[in-house]
Structures are given as C-alpha cells and as structure tokens.
C-alpha cells in the first residue's frame, strides 16, 4: 500500500525537493506546511459576544490550540503564523480582548504572556451570543487556512476571507475532473450570511467588492424576491495561492 502522502508529493513542483531531502530545507517545510494545515472552525458566537468578527476568528483559533487558564507567549510573528493576522489587526484584536477582560497580559523577562479567562468569556457568551439549539446545532463555517493566508497576504481583510468561506461551504462538491474555471452559482442571502458569520450587510458588500476586485468572486441577483447568488474563480484562487506559497520559499 502506498503511503498516504505519495500522491500529494508527486503534484508539487520538482524543484521543491532539491536533492531528494525536502524536509532538510526550512523553506520547503514552510511550503508543505501551508498545504497540510487543518482548517479553522469559525465560532460565530465568539464574534457575537465581542461584537467583532475578527476578534471572534482569533478566539476560534486560540481556543482550538490552547487551554483556558494556560499562559501563552504571543507576539506579532506567532499570531501571523497561527492566524494570518498582521500587526495592525493583531493589536486591535488584542486590545478588544484585553478591554473585555477575556485576555490577561503579563510580561515575563521581556516576553508577553497571555491567558484566557474562560469564566469571563462564558459570561459574555450568555449575555450577547445566540445560544439557541438551532444556532448551536448549525454547521459552522470552516476556513481553509491556505486560502485565508493567501487572501490576507494579498491585502484583503479577514471579512473577505470569511465571506468566501461561506460561498465555498455552500458550493456542492464537484469531482476534480469535472471542475471548471468557476464554481457553480449558489444562493447567498444577506440575512443568512449574517446569521452564520455576524457580518453586517455593509461588511458583506465591502467584502464582496474586495473579492471581485481581485478576481476571485462574482455576484448576481436572481429570482423573485431577488436573492444574491455568488460563485468563485477556482483558477484565480489557485493563481493567488501559488503566488503566496512561492513567497514562502524565497
């Protein structure tokens, strides 16, 4: 039986493997790691509790990786590597969480240490988040980390990445041999997207515009009542992802 990775490795550029020892080169390791990263499960209730989509995303990543009450060393580089958020976004999210009392910050020999206050987070969730059975049981939005980091790398906001993730989640699976340059059109009503992501209608319009400007998303309104439909360009997303991954090997 072939190893599970044999087919994946065969699809990578030959120059990536050099003399046959790809794992000895840190650039190659970064390239492979970008391919195999697990998706992020976005918890919309975190965004509702904090009144911030980006802070909700950061908490989704944080809780997936660290335990409550665990002291964690965080800085710009660590946050960028683990979440894709740049310096400005990280500091804004950090201030939001510190002001809400969810994160505690201490410095230990010049290193910033952070700890999550689980009780405070639970209190905010009970006050501000939709904890109904329907909301809790609804399928969460899953973000492809490679696509997320690709779009952030090319200057888009996390909100644009989140909107694309909703389109991808609603797109029916298509066999690789049958895929076209664009995905099929799928309905994307604004209110439904708000319920699943906490993105306002204005934020959705801006995110869609940013995705259209970079050539990733197309939208149209059909039917009666008129409903927004969207599709994304697999070809353009692949080009942007390749550009981002090439930057990891420079």
Segments predicted by a language model, with ranges:
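Short recognition helix of helix-turn-helix/winged-helix DNA-binding domains
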Residues: 1-78, 95-102, 111-112, 116-191
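Short helix-coil junctions and helix-kink-helix linkers
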Residues: 76-87, 190-201
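Short amphipathic alpha-helical interaction segments
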Residues: 85-96, 199-210
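A short, conserved structural fragment
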Residues: 98-108, 212-222
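Short, Lys/Arg-rich nucleic-acid/phosphate-binding segment
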Residues: 107-113, 221-230
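Short, charged/polar, Gly/Pro-enriched secondary-structure boundary elements
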Residues: 119-126, 235-243
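Mid-protein regulatory/catalytic core that forms ligand/cofactor-binding pockets
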Residues: 155, 189-196, 206, 210-219
